[in-house]
A protein has these predicted regions:
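Short, non-transmembrane alpha-helical segments in secretory-pathway proteins
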Residues: 11-55
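Short, flexible coil/linker elements and helix-boundary hinge sites characteristic
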Residues: 34, 42-46, 61-62, 94, ...
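Amphipathic, interaction-prone secondary-structure segments
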Residues: 51-107
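A short, surface-exposed interaction/processing loop segment used at functional sites
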Residues: 100-139
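C-terminal partner/receptor-binding element of secreted or periplasmic proteins
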Residues: 132-157
Length: 157
């Protein structure tokens, strides 16, 4: 039996499973980057080592994802219940339109990683990589270390 896009049902299930595994791997990488950032802060100022360890554990336990129609939203929940979006992953090809002036009319690919504009909205000007292809296409973008937290989390002291 085939789906409306011509794929065998088994193929579609495998594709969804691969995307889920890629998102879970990305979350592990985000956690690892957060721990590296936390360790670099502890080296700079060793006064709050215990608090940084607790903070890193809370981050690890609070990061999760939610599957929506077009996106997979990756977000964190802190111990007070406050939530913040880390980013979005495109679920299927040709469902999200690129809004950049030079690329207008093109669609994002399945697995493309987008930054968050707000809680429910992704930044659709460009992708910062693709989790299925293991690429980070952001060398010329404003934040070249993304998703490395040494830049993203530089505001904490």
């Amino acid at each position: 039996m085939r789906t409306f896009d011509g794929l065998l049902i088994e193929d579609k299930k495998v594709r969804q499973k691969n995307l889920k595994h890629s998102v879970e791997f990305l979350i592990c990488e985000i956690i690892e980057n957060y721990y590296r950032w936390s360790d670099s802060i502890k080296m700079r100022n060793g006064d709050d080592c215990d608090y940084r360890d607790v903070q890193a554990d809370e981050f690890k336990n609070g990061i999760t994802y939610k599957v929506n129609n077009k996106y997979i939203k990756i977000y964190t929940v802190d111990k007070w219940g406050q939530r913040s979006v880390w980013g979005f992953v495109i679920r299927e090809n040709d469902t999200v339109l690129c809004t950049h002036g030079l690329n207008g009319g093109n669609h994002f690919s399945r697995g493309d990683l987008l930054r968050a504009r707000s809680w429910n909205q992704a930044e659709t000007k460009y992708s910062v990589g693709n989790i299925l292809k293991c690429t980070m296409d952001n060398l010329t973008k404003p934040n070249p270390d993304y998703p490395d937290y040494k830049t993203v989390w530089s505001g904490a002291r």
